[in-house]
Amino acid sequence: MARSIIAVLPAAGVGSRMQADKPKQYLTLLGKTLLEHTLDVMLSYPAVSKIILAVSKDDPYISTLSLDPKIQLVEGGTTRAESVLNGLNVIAEKNAWVLVHDAARPCLQHADIDKLLAIEDKQGAILAIPVTDTIKRADNQQCIVKTEDRSQLWQAMTPQFFPVDILRDALSTGIQQGANITDEASAIELAGFRPHLVAGRSDNLKVTRPEDLALAEFYLTRNKL
């Protein structure tokens, strides 16, 4: 049976580090919100059959957007893990795999999705890039304790790609155990799996701080040329 590919975008966060007057996914670049740019990437990828968008219950902005019929809204949770799980819980398709992607990563390119979808191992896979900067471990006073060996360190990105049933079980268990789930792979790891690392592009940045906006605008402009 051919697997179906569904995208889940958790978009219920407030993005406090952006210091903006609205959640960062609703900031505007090149005439569209960050969220719309990100949705466009998934909507234009032929293999994605549906997009599930998890938004805050009292989100005042989502109703102002013109959403494609392929997009299904679900109520987000208080954490990323809960929002993603809420999205997974409405998926009824058999043999479905899910691409979980940050709403504030608008510069994703289809070639990187291609590489993820080439993975058929049920351990799953995530986009990531090898760490190139020197990494320091700090103490509580923000002083350097040691320099870490970066030779086997990777920076996790999204999309992260897993069978729906495996990710659903892993997130449910992790949440029940009170685990620190910072991305989907961390829940999968706790369940005993070893997801593949797929080398992605460094321009697939997550807009987190004000200075990221100009860089995202540059990449989006370049990608449209």
Curated annotation (Swiss-Prot):
Its EC number is 2.7.7.60. The record marks 150, 206 as: Positions MEP for the nucleophilic attack. Pfam families: IspD. The keyword Disulfide bond does not apply. It is an enzyme of class 2 (transferase). The record marks 17, 24 as: Transition state stabilizer. It comes from the Bacteria. Keywords: Isoprene biosynthesis, Nucleotidyltransferase, Transferase. GO terms for biological process: isopentenyl diphosphate biosynthetic process, methylerythritol 4-phosphate pathway. HAMAP family: IspD. Belongs to the IspD/TarI cytidylyltransferase family. IspD subfamily. This is 2-C-methyl-D-erythritol 4-phosphate cytidylyltransferase. The lineage of its organism: Bacteria, Pseudomonadati, Pseudomonadota, Gammaproteobacteria, Pasteurellales.
